[in-house]
């Protein structure tokens, strides 16, 4: 009886909202064709894949492709680098985006603020290969802008492309420059939705601007912050291939501190040509990322139900 009632309720909902469901059909089809059907390719991770024989006739080798990746210490280094960079990107990006959003909102709707918003989001539309080309002009040992400036003031120059310890902060700063402005726009949209009467009531009680920010704005943004964090967490095992490879390339001097999973997969595919090994690494990356999202979502749901994605 209960199952029949649920079916009838679902059918009524389908009929009542038929036009909304029709609008969703293109997005559903797009997801099925480009996100779910390609997942059949995961089988390559368990095969000695031969393009001529195809997916269904290649030799099955079990977990041998995974053994190739996990047999040495290299996988620990690139996993650490991947997680480290993404955690730094998420933490610093969230803090700076929030700070920019709050500051610009407090400044009001002047022409200066609108110009600043346009300038902030501009780096988001510049591709990483273009940034990589500009970085050469800044970081080259002899003719780079930074080293020429250091020489002018009598300071010692820095050989950026052989000094691996300097690149983690460079990558974090460049990521902030490119993404923080766009992230601030998202938080500004959330701030606009906060009830203005709450601020008016707080000011009538004698609250300062700083108190309004910490007692009203930031607490009201909690759900948005958690939601964006959960979405970012899904990519914490993503290696930012376009960013890091555009800036560093195949520089062996910097491998230990800048190699991430995506770059390792890209290099392995070019050097070994084994699709099975690269797919095994990509599968490891995806499974760990999925587990992290599910775990973080459960924790967020227990702490605050409104903050969970599902």
What name fits each language-model region?
Residues 1-14:
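Short, Lys/Arg-rich, polar N-terminal cytosolic tail immediately upstream
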């Amino acid at each position: 009886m209960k199952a029949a009632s649920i079916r009838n309720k679902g059918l009524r909902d389908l009929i009542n909202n038929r036009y909304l469901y029709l609008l969703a059909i293109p997005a559903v089809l797009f997801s099925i064709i480009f996100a779910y059907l390609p997942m059949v390719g995961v089988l390559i991770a368990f095969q000695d894949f031969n393009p001529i024989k195809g997916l269904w006739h290649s030799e099955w080798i079990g977990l041998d492709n995974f053994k190739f990746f996990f047999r040495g210490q290299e996988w620990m280094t690139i996993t650490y680098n991947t997680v480290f960079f993404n955690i730094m990107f998420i933490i610093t990006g969230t803090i700076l985006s929030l700070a920019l959003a709050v500051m610009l909102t407090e400044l009001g709707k002047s022409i200066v603020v609108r110009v600043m918003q346009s300038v902030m989001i501009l780096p988001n539309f510049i591709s990483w290969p273009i940034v990589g080309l500009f970085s050469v002009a800044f970081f080259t040992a002899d003719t780079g802008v930074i080293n020429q400036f250091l020489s002018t003031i009598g300071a010692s120059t820095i050989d950026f492309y052989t000094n691996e310890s300097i690149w983690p902060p460079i990558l974090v700063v460049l990521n902030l420059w490119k993404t923080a402005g766009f992230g601030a726009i998202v938080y500004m949209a959330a701030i606009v939705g906060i009830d203005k009467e709450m601020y008016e009531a707080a000011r009538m009680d004698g609250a300062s601007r700083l108190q309004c920010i910490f007692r009203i704005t930031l607490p009201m943004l909690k759900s948005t912050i958690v939601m964006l964090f959960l979405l970012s967490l899904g990519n914490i095992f993503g290696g930012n291939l376009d960013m890091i490879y555009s800036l560093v390339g195949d520089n062996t001097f910097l491998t230990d501190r800048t190699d991430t999973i995506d770059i390792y997969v890209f290099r392995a595919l070019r050097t070994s040509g084994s699709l099975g090994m690269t797919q095994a690494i990509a599968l490891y990356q995806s499974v760990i990322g999925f587990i992290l999202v599910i775990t973080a979502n459960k924790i967020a749901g227990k702490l605050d139900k409104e903050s969970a994605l599902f």
